[in-house]
């Protein structure tokens, strides 16, 4: 399947490298506002076509799937345009800010019989499936704790007076939408939507959340999801029951190492060495090859639930976007 890449940032480069590992994918074109950045990406990965106009790339009959790697606030309009042009879409996380936008795009994809995916690593990792399998082994679940704290390479720019898109409310930036989203995907993917959502952010003077703690309440257990772009700490997920616990490191975006711990029993460990994007791209390629719309729609259902939680969290904290 021929891919057109929209955007030239670091995640676009990462995904271009992953696409190259999968024979089913071929990067056919890249679209950038600036010719020079588009040409640089194209040269690095052997991409034959460079566009500076998105509509022109969408009009290219060779493009079958558009990968959208642009600021969060652009995802809705760019995804809709691609679907209307008859293209399958892989949209970088976070999918879109609102439930209404998510519902509209998913309905449009189904109407046009197109594939639509949110690019999110969490659900595709083998250890994520293993964590679900081991839930019964830890007894009654009581606490889930997820931590993703990564000092942003753009945070110093924010402190100096600049407003990078990742810290701009107008671009739907912030720690919740960029990092804590992975924690939400991990939890909601396993347990569905919570009963109650509350978000407790640290706010910068422009109103953006640079870090925060999200609480998700379920009938029999509670989840604490910590996400930060203004400080750093080791990442992890812990699912703690009354008969044991599951530890995942380095966290919800990369379930590389899993350990099942139970008193009086030998630990069960699982470790994978591939990048988390490898599993994401490989599974999407398989879904496309099999024309497995049911798998696509099941993933979109989880995306809808995550968007619902994130929108509720922003409303609870009165973030204003």
Q: What residue ranges belong to the model's regions?
A:
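Rossmann-fold dehydrogenase core element
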Residues: 104-122, 140-143
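Contiguous beta-strand/loop segments that form the cofactor/metal-binding neighborhood of enzyme cores
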Residues: 183-253, 282-291
């Amino acid at each position: 399947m021929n891919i057109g890449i929209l955007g030239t940032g670091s995640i676009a480069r990462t995904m271009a490298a992953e696409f190259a590992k999968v024979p089913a994918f071929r990067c056919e074109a890249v679209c950038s506002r600036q010719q020079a950045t588009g040409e640089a990406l194209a040269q690095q990965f052997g991409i034959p076509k460079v566009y500076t106009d998105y509509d022109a790339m969408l009009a290219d009959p060779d493009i079958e799937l558009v990968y959208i790697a642009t600021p969060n606030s652009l995802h809705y309009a760019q995804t809709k345009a691609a679907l209307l042009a008859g293209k399958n879409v892989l949209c970088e996380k976070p999918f879109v800010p609102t439930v209404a936008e998510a519902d509209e795009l998913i309905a449009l994809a189904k109407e046009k019989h197109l594939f639509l995916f949110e690019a999110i690593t969490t659900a595709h990792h083998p250890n994520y499936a293993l964590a679900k399998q081991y839930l019964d082994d830890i007894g009654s679940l009581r606490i889930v704790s997820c931590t993703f704290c990564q000092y942003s390479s753009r945070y110093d720019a924010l402190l100096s007076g600049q407003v990078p898109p990742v810290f701009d409310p107008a671009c739907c930036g912030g720690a919740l939408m960029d990092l804590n989203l992975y924690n939400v995907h991990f939890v909601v993917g396993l347990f569905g939507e919570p009963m109650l959502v509350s978000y407790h952010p640290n706010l910068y003077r422009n109103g953006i959340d640079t870090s925060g703690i999200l609480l998700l309440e379920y009938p029999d257990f509670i989840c604490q999801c910590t996400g930060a772009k203004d400080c750093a700490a080791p990442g992890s997920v812990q699912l703690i029951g009354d008969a044991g616990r599951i530890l995942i490191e380095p966290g919800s975006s990369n379930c590389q190492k899993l350990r099942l711990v139970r008193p009086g029993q030998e630990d069960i460990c699982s470790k994978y060495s591939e990048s988390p994007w490898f599993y994401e791209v490989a599974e999407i390629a398989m879904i496309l090859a099999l024309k497995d719309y049911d798998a696509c729609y099941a993933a979109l259902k989880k995306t809808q639930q995550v968007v619902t939680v994130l929108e509720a969290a922003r409303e609870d904290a009165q973030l204003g976007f």
